[in-house]
Amino acid sequence: MVITVKVIVIVAVAAAVLSTAFAVAGQSFVDLRATAQDAELKKNTIGGHAAGYGLYETSGDVLDPVNSYGNVSGPAVIDPDKYLRSFDYGRVSKLANGSTVREFTLVADDRQVMEIAPGVFYNVWTFNGTIPGPTLRATEGDLIRINFINNGSKPHSIHTHGIHKSEMDGVFETINPQGKFVYEFYAEAFGVYPYHCHVTPLEEHISHGLYGVYIVDPKTPRPQADEMVMIMNGFDTDFDTENNFYAVNTIPYYYMHHPIEIEKDKLVRVYLVNMLEFDQINNFHLHGNLYQLYRSGTNTTPDEYTDMVTMSQGERAILEFNFKYPGQYMFHAHKTEFAEKGWVGLFLVKDPSQIQSASGGGSSSGGYNGSISSYPLTTTTISGDVGT
């Protein structure tokens, strides 16, 4: 017992000395493990008031995505509200045979340091400056042209799940820094797909943020709905292959502090993708309701009517539901550790007269010119047609 007390005292003194040394040196030092522990201990608040969900303990503070923090200038890595309902339909043109061409530009960078939670900074790797990258959207049969530019310091690529030729798979044509590549393929098999860097070590490129969502709509459109994209992700901030923070759309606890407003009785469609590294499974549980589950989104007939779906890494689904009653309804990972470390949010269901219109946004290539000629970098050429 005496030895134990001495050890504790020594450790405590050493910790105090180290903490003082960092403070005296004037360094911007963040103890990420302590931050993760604090995130578990502090109660969540919304606008300074308790949310009423005492079982879910959160940081109490949430990152404001439109402001700058600490020593890092510029916005946070994503605005979850803006991302939620934004779809990039690309620059549209027509081929001689009448086929639609959708041209996108994705720029990879691996040199940014951004804040992912209050006081927690991370070396983010991004497509077009955000995690996740822009949501690319097309209709089955469209010709997809992705102008890829590697503005990073490491080799990168783009691997899009779905049907395409081998040379368009993003595995063998690694693009070196300052290089370019043009991916071309037809949008085949409607559904929801992830895209991500496929350079090894793969877990490093994905866990740092090089991923996004690619949606192929069926030729006969799905019923009109309030559509949104949710990527389940997380961050290993101390690099021990165990995540310290979990989220949907990158910012932990964000939708607890900023509930997603939806209209009572209106059809909601969620494109859900699991891009969480290091943990083998993730899931989505909805309170007070059930949803029609379309696994991979490759069928127009639902696979299941449920309030819970579990996914492995890279799996995805479409969820459709509507709420009969107004109020606040939680959604979260049913792996409690994930929820208590950030993967938790709220839907705020309102009568139509009380809610602003929630229309989907759009952009042209995530703010980048769709033409690859706009970027005077080394070009990697390809040969052959793109298939039919």
List the model feature ranges, each with a label.
Residues 2-388:
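Copper-binding active sites and cupredoxin-like electron-transfer domains
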